[in-house]
Amino acid sequence: MTCADHPAPDPDTPLLADSLRASGYAVDVQDWRDSSVDWSGARVTVLRSPWDYVDHLDEFLAWAARTSKQSELWNPLAIVRWNTHKSYLLDLAARGAPIVPTVVLLGGSAASLDRICDAQGWNAVVVKPAVASGGQGARRAGVGDPDAQGHLDELLARGDVLVQQFVPAVEDEGEWSVVLVDGQVGHALRKQPAPGDYRVQHEWGGRTELATPSTGLSELATRVFALLPAPALYARIDVVPIGGQWHVMELEATEPSLWLDLAPATTRLLVDAIGARLSPRTG
């Protein structure tokens, strides 16, 4: 399942769809907002790139609830509801996962960025919407930045907001991402920002390369995957180093880019995992 209303193509879906077809499965790629689609005709519905859900969250959650009654939804509804609002980070922390220090602010509330920084002991932060993807609406800010306070006020007028401690290592070392399938590490990626930026997404000039995760990183990713609120088909866990230890910055289990073109073995893992959910074979 994908979306039609997005300027950038999703390179993962064609690779996965072709690999499933080559393994003997019937595959249709559909836009979740297409009301003519009969989702009950699918034994399994795999969420891949519904990237426009951030602009239609209530509609998307209603679609997921309906579809989960008609088809086997992966990832399941409980994960979709949990993962589409970044407050899931606080839940992960409560379950024992190390996260980048985060404060969640409710939409419509009034908050002082300087007071938050003072209370937390932070010199710099990243302010971002609680419902967003691809770095949308994110802004780095330092203490005493009046423009950043205005940005926070604008975001709060629209909805809930995350304020996260800025991790300086991102500028030099970038982020690491670990892609897991059924709890098994498929591959890892190192994502680095463009010079002078902190955002690692390609929309902002970032670059991504396949990398070998350390044993500690793989173990952390596996442990965090097990903390999801329901069994999951896949997830991408984004981490950064703080004080020599990995901390979760985000966890994507609804619409993550997986860079399957860099990791054909992970594509095979996904095909096998989806196949295990399909009985008997179709097509």
Language model features with spans:
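A short beta-strand motif that forms the metal-chelation/ATP-contact edge
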Residues: 42-47, 177-180, 245-257
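Anionic group-transfer/hydrolysis microenvironments
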Residues: 50, 130, 166-167, 179, ...
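Short secondary-structure junctions
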Residues: 25, 97-98, 121, 228-233
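Active-site nucleotide/adenylate-binding loops and adjacent lid/helix of ATP-dependent enzymes
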Residues: 64-69, 77-173, 215-218
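Short, basic and Ser/Thr-rich N-terminal targeting/leader segments
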Residues: 23, 134, 172-174, 233-235
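Conserved N-proximal alpha/beta basic substrate-recognition cap immediately N-terminal to
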Residues: 4-106
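ATP-dependent carboxylate activation and anion-phosphoryl transfer catalytic cores
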Residues: 215-283
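Phosphate-binding site of ATP-dependent enzymes
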Residues: 136, 140-229, 240, 247
